[in-house]
């Protein structure tokens, strides 16, 4: 009997990379690409051949209550609202902004409060890459940290801890509930969760662009991301059912434009990007 667990991307990767054999996961889904440190952990534990399969796309959605006024933010504004330290007059200071309008008079004149995913979540990692790091660069902070090299990106990802940024766990339903309780509050999650809660919440625009299926598929929406899963090559052919599962998961009836996964929010790959199990060898293998 298949065993399915919800762990978040980071937690899933730890379990996946813990070893080979029936006591360890065969497959892990991920809302971000596997990290170098995770590849090294896999190698350390004998997981030496990992196949990556991109199954579709998703768009992070920054949402708020239907009762709220429409809002539009760019990456720089979001970084300045959420970062632990921000550049002011050429110097870094602890984030002083309490209202959005203090960042830009065109923004809402109410408190900054954003519900975010936990650090172990692939959604949080995608948000930090697509919003915090890009916003950090636009604000000039990244260049000011240039002597740190790659560590500059880590600095860009650090969120403030004064109550303006609130970790809300992996429970998207709870985030939706909290958004409906306060029209000044924002929170983010995957596009599919917006679709099933359109009677309660609405999206903000990012740099003037609202999340749509088309915008996510062609990546014109600024915070679109790929979704993928990872499978242990060593388990294919030795663990019953894996080949059949892969054939089904990558079939057009599942992940195609009219597939049943699109009915629950998956944004299908374009025809040029579409894959099937018979073409797995053309995809990235980490060894």
Language-model segment annotations:
Residues 282-287:
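A short, hydrophobic C-terminal helix/tail in secreted or cell-surface proteins
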Residues 1-281:
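Flexible loop/hinge segments at secondary-structure junctions
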């Amino acid at each position: 009997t298949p065993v399915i667990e919800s762990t978040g991307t980071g937690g899933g990767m730890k379990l996946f990379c813990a070893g080979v054999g029936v006591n360890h996961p065969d497959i892990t889904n991920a809302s971000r690409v596997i990290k170098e440190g995770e590849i090294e952990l896999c190698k350390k534990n004998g997981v030496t051949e990992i196949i990556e399969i991109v199954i579709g796309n998703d768009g992070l959605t920054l949402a708020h209550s239907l009762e709220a006024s429409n809002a539009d933010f760019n990456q720089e504004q979001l970084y300045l609202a959420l970062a632990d330290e921000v550049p002011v007059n050429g110097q870094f200071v602890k984030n002083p902004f309490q209202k959005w309008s203090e960042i830009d008079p065109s923004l809402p004149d109410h408190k900054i409060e954003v519900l975010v995913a936990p650090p172990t979540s692939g959604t949080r990692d995608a948000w930090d890459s697509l919003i915090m790091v890009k916003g950090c660069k636009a604000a000039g902070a990244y260049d000011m940290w240039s002597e740190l090299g790659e560590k500059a990106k880590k600095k860009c990802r650090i969120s403030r801890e004064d109550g303006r940024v609130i970790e809300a766990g992996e429970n998207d339903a709870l985030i939706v509930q909290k958004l409906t309780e306060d029209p000044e509050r924002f929170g983010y999650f995957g596009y599919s969760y917006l679709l099933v809660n359109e009677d309660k919440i609405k999206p903000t625009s990012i740099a003037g662009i609202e999340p749509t299926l088309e915008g996510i598929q062609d990546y014109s929406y600024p915070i679109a991301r790929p979704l993928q899963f990872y499978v242990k090559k060593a388990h294919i052919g030795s663990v019953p059912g894996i080949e059949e599962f892969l054939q089904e998961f990558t079939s057009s009836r599942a992940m195609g434009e009219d597939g049943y996964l699109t009915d629950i929010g998956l944004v299908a790959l374009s025809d040029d990007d579409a894959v099937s199990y018979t073409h797995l060898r053309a995809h990235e293998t980490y060894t």
